Regions:
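Short active-site-adjacent structural elements
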Residues: 86-89, 120, 143-144
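Mid-to-C-terminal catalytic subdomains of enzymes
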Residues: 21, 61-113
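Active-site adenylate/phosphate-handling loop in enzymes that bind or generate adenylated species
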Residues: 1-65, 143, 148-156
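Short cysteine-rich clusters marking metal-coordination/redox-active sites
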Residues: 133-137, 146-149
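Short alpha-helical scaffolding segments that buttress acidic/His motifs in well-ordered protein cores
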Residues: 27-28, 111, 115
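Short, flexible, mixed-charge glycine/proline-rich loop motifs
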Residues: 119-130, 136-141
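Thr-Gly-centered strand-to-loop micro-motif
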Residues: 55-57, 79-80, 134
């Protein structure tokens, strides 16, 4: 869905709002799940002509700083919390990393730096994942179905 909308707008890239907290949580969650592929994945945007590359301009800004900026500039839209959050691994990881960051400032940055260092030391052939096409909608994906079609399939 994002790719399609970005193509319709003739966009060069899609900027996401992922902040340092999100990035660090994802790194830890991938390792806790034993998902080495996702932990080390990077997509070759040349492998799918429909893929619009993602950029993360806030990935080195803390969630606290990002929210403060949004509040000061009237940019935040109140969003209800997902009722299933309490069951998600991310909630536990977020709480744990928040406590670590409070006790040992810089923890989140060190996690993100460590992940970048790990990726920089890996051979490109080990890191880059070729994108294919979703079997249902034809959008770029590293899986049989894209995330949107997976969600639709779960709902039906």
């Amino acid at each position: 869905a994002l790719n399609r909308a970005a193509r319709e707008m003739d966009a060069d890239s899609i900027a996401t709002g992922h902040c340092l907290d999100d990035e660090s949580q994802s790194v830890v969650m991938n390792y806790l799940r034993g998902d080495v592929t996702r932990a080390t994945a990077s997509f070759n945007s040349n492998s799918a002509e429909l893929f619009i590359p993602r950029i993360k301009p806030l990935c080195r800004s803390s969630e606290r700083a990002t929210v403060a900026y949004g509040l000061c500039n009237n940019l935040l839209v109140p969003l209800p919390e997902c009722p299933y959050t309490r069951y998600a691994l991310r909630k536990d990881v977020r709480t744990w990393l928040g406590k670590l960051e409070y006790a040992k400032p810089g923890t989140l940055t060190r996690i993100a730096d460590g992940q970048e260092e790990l990726l920089s030391r890996m051979p490109k052939s080990e890191v880059v994942t070729e994108l294919g096409r979703c079997e249902k909608c034809g959008e770029p994906t590293a899986n049989r179905l894209c995330a949107a079609c997976q969600q639709l399939e779960r709902l039906m």
